[in-house]
């Protein structure tokens, strides 16, 4: 740890152009500050999944190019074997009704690094929605119920897995086509 305030000034100055370049990319996605509200994480996720981010703190988090709306939930799994995605600090029946009309993207991170992202259809979350509704019979709201990461991994369709390139990227770098793959040709 530095003992003098300016000991690492040259280091941060040399790194800063990369941060500014990252912010320039984030500007294209409507992210005003990569250091606020998980801006850098949302930028990485938007690029990895091809979703457009919806600005604001209320309503859907993202939409795809054909207009489907998405809830996006993230969790930092650094140092954890299991965990859960937080949802809403004031979960009500109205919130659940809204959730039933959206697709979902769940993403796990190792600190700032996107590790995996899964697409989950609302109907696949129905067991969780029903449990929440059952719990709401005796309460006016639930305080941030979680959706287990392992459950999402079980029911979700992978959209992104770190270190596993998507099929289009493999073709782009190797020149191997789907016909080559089906006929047994390798790179």
Question: What residue ranges belong to the model's regions?
Answer:
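Nucleic-acid endonuclease domains
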Residues: 1-187
